[in-house]
């Protein structure tokens, strides 16, 4: 990847994860990474840890940037877009990791056409995430390559042609860790209920999750086939799965993900209804 200057607007956990990944993979030099945050102490902390250049002024941070990463909370987006409008360098790529912020909203808000919208998930903070992303028509092939390499530093990445997939990704992978944690929590609590000390129950569940995923990835078979391998006729797995099916767990999971997808679509519609008009 060519060495480019990257300005982060907002320097929270996800921005820090991107900085760590970029430096770890030697995709950028510290002096070419600019971190803007209204909290001066946060910028100084990032400078001390990673050698990046801190800013409290967003316009100063983006002035010489080849890429601008929007990594702020959604409730701050409108104000930041208004502040940056007309000031993004013409050649620069804007990469957003803000949930629910559409390409149209960002492009209109900034008066800038080169936009990439992403949907990462929280494991990206440790380089184990999955990020789904889409690019506007104005983004060049070279900029797409830059984005792909940067997002790869957060874990896996999937490029899609249709922005509609971002709402689906929000419900499946973006919100997915919450489903996994809830299932883990239920299993851990069941272990404690049976009599295990909590620390042992946690270790058993965590390694079972980790090992099951790794085993699945190393075997080129359908996940249902692996489930059948551990489900002996009349055995404990068959009994447990019978109760899960009887309780409608499979249907509940499907409906929950569909509900999250519908909510993501609703938030997008609400966003369109509340886009402020220029005066």
Residue spans of the language-model regions?
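NAD(P)-dependent Rossmann-like dehydrogenase/reductase catalytic/cofactor-binding core
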Residues: 2, 206-279
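Rossmann-like NAD(P)(H) cofactor-binding subdomain of soluble oxidoreductases
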Residues: 40, 49-50, 58-133, 137
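NAD(P)+-binding Rossmann beta1-loop-alpha1 motif at the extreme N-terminus of oxidoreductases
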Residues: 1-56, 60-63, 129, 192-193
